[in-house]
UniProtKB/Swiss-Prot annotation:
It is found in: Cytoplasm. Disulfide bonds: none annotated. It catalyses: 7-aminomethyl-7-carbaguanosine(34) in tRNA + S-adenosyl-L-methionine = epoxyqueuosine(34) in tRNA + adenine + L-methionine + 2 H(+). It comes from Sinorhizobium medicae (strain WSM419). Pathway: tRNA modification; tRNA-queuosine biosynthesis. One of its GO terms (cellular component) is cytoplasm. It comes from the Bacteria. This is S-adenosylmethionine:tRNA ribosyltransferase-isomerase. Transmembrane segments: none annotated. The keyword Lyase does not apply.
Length: 360
């Protein structure tokens, strides 16, 4: 499909720079393809009223790490211009793949030192060597530290990697370390938050429990590739980034039991949906699964396991707007987004939410 079919005009002031407070006070646009009404303006706290006893919410419990690193490149005895690197996938205890800016100033063999400029690492300087250079600004870094020691150093010198549309408007601060993290995050490794989950609070969980809604957790470590623009003119020519995920056998069995008794699998966020669909067989049976997924969902995809999707509002021509268009229908989602923009919904990671029913 032509990528420009997924384009729309998004005013700059529609992008939220801070989350709603409290988290569960965000607005929620309910989208029912072919329903009456198709679009309904509600709030996140209304979520339980759209679910039935026995339905199951699926959350991504990945935890964001401060993966934005500001460093200085060394080549021989010469110090060059500062470089910025966003870690996006760990490939070994001492190695990370990262996106570099400006990538043209790095080559294999270069050394990069982090943690200077008043933010020194408590363990000493954090240094890495550029081991490989790939496409689209990607490099592989081999750090001098490894395992937990490296994790501690990254926590000390790193910054929360705010999405570009937010980072271009303001710098990250101490609030983001809390705001850009779900209350149930536990598995460290993401460099972007599963943002649909940011709306959940203890109050909302209590309401869902009272309504008899199950909750289950899977893990997909969201990578910085989620921010990459689609540069191809046709979706067939786009290469999707891969992310590491895991669905354990107990969770798979419980979700299959929900489906067998007529309950619905409600994915909280596109990351949960992509992982559940990666783990599902053609008949919708969900299996234990672990590995890298590069699943790219566009209109025409036949959903196997997910019945409903709660998700924030996405950017024009993004792979995530393509995904929601596949789920609820392109024209329905174009109408939904036009309504959201006209009525002041807040977009992107810190923005409002939508609840999508799957198109038949």
């Amino acid at each position: 499909m032509r990528v420009d079919l997924f384009d729309f005009d998004l005013p700059e002031d529609s992008v939220a720079l801070r989350p709603a407070s409290p988290r569960d006070s965000a607005r929620m646009l309910v989208v029912r393809p072919g329903g009456e009404p198709v679009l309904e303006d509600r709030g996140v706290l209304d979520l339980p009223s759209f679910l039935r006893q026995g339905d199951a919410l699926v959350f991504n419990d990945t935890k964001v790490i401060p993966a934005q690193l500001e460093g200085v490149r060394y080549r021989g005895e010469h110090i060059s211009t500062p470089v910025s690197l966003t870690l996006h996938m760990r490939v070994a205890p001492d190695r990370w793949k990262a996106f570099a800016r400006p990538a043209r100033r790095l080559k294999p063999g270069d050394r990069v030192s982090f943690g200077h400029g008043g933010n020194a690492c408590l363990l000493g300087s954090l240094d890495a060597m550029v081991e490989e250079k790939g496409d689209a600004g990607e490099v592989t870094l081999r750090f001098d530290l490894s395992g937990p020691s490296l994790d501690e150093a990254i926590m000390s010198v790193g910054h929360i990697p705010l999405p570009p549309y937010i980072a271009s408007k303001r710098a990250d601060d101490a609030r983001d370390r809390t705001d850009y993290q779900t209350v149930y995050a536990r598995e460290e490794g993401a460099v972007a938050a599963p943002t649909a989950g940011l709306h959940f609070t203890d109050r909302l969980f209590a309401m869902l429990d009272e309504a008899g809604i199950e909750r289950h957790f899977v893990t997909l470590h969201v990578g910085a590739g989620t921010f990459l623009p689609v540069k191809a003119d046709d979706t067939d020519d786009h290469v999707m980034h891969e992310e590491i995920g895991h669905v354990d056998a107990v969770t798979a069995a419980k979700l299959n039991a929900v489906r067998e008794r007529g309950g619905r699998v409600v994915c909280v966020g596109t990351t949960s949906l992509r992982l559940v669909e990666s783990a599902a067989a053609e008949d919708g049976t969900i299996h234990a699964w672990s590995g890298a997924t590069g699943i790219f969902i566009t209109p025409g995809y036949r959903f196997r396991a997910a019945h409903m999707l709660m998700t924030n509002f996405h950017l024009p021509k993004s792979t995530l707007f393509m995904l929601v268009s596949a789920f609820a229908g392109l024209e329905t989602m174009r109408d939904a987004y036009a309504h959201a923009i006209a009525t002041g919904y807040r977009f992107y990671s810190y923005g409002d939410s939508s609840l999508l029913f799957r198109k038949d």
